């Protein structure tokens, strides 16, 4: 095996950092995650695996709060996510304690992306094998935000985006169907996008919502998700029936 394939800080002759590319591959094999930014709502939806009967499903959640006004979902290695989330939470608390002000969504995104980039350039470590979707409301303007970071340390702002397995298919769906909306329509779009790749319906979907009016992140209950999925399926069936037209008379 070539030296640049083993070493994190050595470029290959054609300009690749293979350890970063391997981390990106870990993201592509991870659970699908979707983020949608509405006018007054931000939504994160992730694909979740079925939990054993004896496991507390709350301990396996993939959407977490970083602060009262910021939440994060990720795709990739769960253990790596735990480390990154803990560091981000400490930074949020430190910022409040030192400056007596909450962090902005962009600030904590830059911090997380900076950590990920640092781990592509340092000896004795490896890149974080995860990509994050970060949503929240600016504490001053109260405007909604959605950002994505990846293992290379790159970050960017989005109206709607996806990461994890089949993220390209989900992103194409979002590009065709995204309209700036509010409330339930934003939630419905996120779930519709995830259903493009999740075949088992609402039981394997985790959804969390943050609104301008309410403080904190609200995890949707299974019954709420099932009701929205049923509505989406009914609308889809009605649209297909409309395409076929009325039955022909014999």
Swiss-Prot record:
Keyword Cytoplasm among UniProt keywords: yes
The protein's name: Proteasome subunit alpha type-7-B
Record-linked Pfam families: Proteasome (PF00227), Proteasome_A_N (PF10584)
Principal subcellular localisation of the protein: cytoplasm
UniProt cross-references to InterPro entries, sorted A to Z: Ntn_hydrolases_N (IPR029055), Proteasome_alpha (IPR050115), Proteasome_alpha-type (IPR023332), Proteasome_asu_N (IPR000426), Proteasome_sua/b (IPR001353)
Cellular component aspect of the GO annotation: nucleus; plastid; proteasome complex; proteasome core complex, alpha-subunit complex; vacuole
Chain's role: The proteasome is a multicatalytic proteinase complex which is characterized by its ability to cleave peptides with Arg, Phe, Tyr, Leu, and Glu adjacent to the leaving group at neutral or slightly basic pH. The proteasome has an ATP-dependent proteolytic activity.
Crosslink feature (Glycyl lysine isopeptide (Lys-Gly) (interchain with G-Cter in ubiquitin)) location: 62
Organism: Arabidopsis thaliana
Quaternary context: Component of the 20S core complex of the 26S proteasome. The 26S proteasome is composed of a core protease (CP), known as the 20S proteasome, capped at one or both ends by the 19S regulatory particle (RP/PA700). The 20S proteasome core is composed of 28 subunits that are arranged in four stacked rings, resulting in a barrel-shaped structure. The two end rings are each formed by seven alpha subunits, and the two central rings are each formed by seven beta subunits. The catalytic chamber with the active sites is on the inside of the barrel.
Taxonomy of the source species: Eukaryota, Viridiplantae, Streptophyta, Embryophyta, Tracheophyta
One GO term of the biological process aspect: ubiquitin-dependent protein catabolic process
Signal peptide: none
Tree of life domain: Eukaryota
Family membership noted in the UniProt record: Belongs to the peptidase T1A family.
Key words, A-Z: Cytoplasm, Isopeptide bond, Nucleus, Proteasome, Ubl conjugation
Subcellular location: Cytoplasm; Nucleus
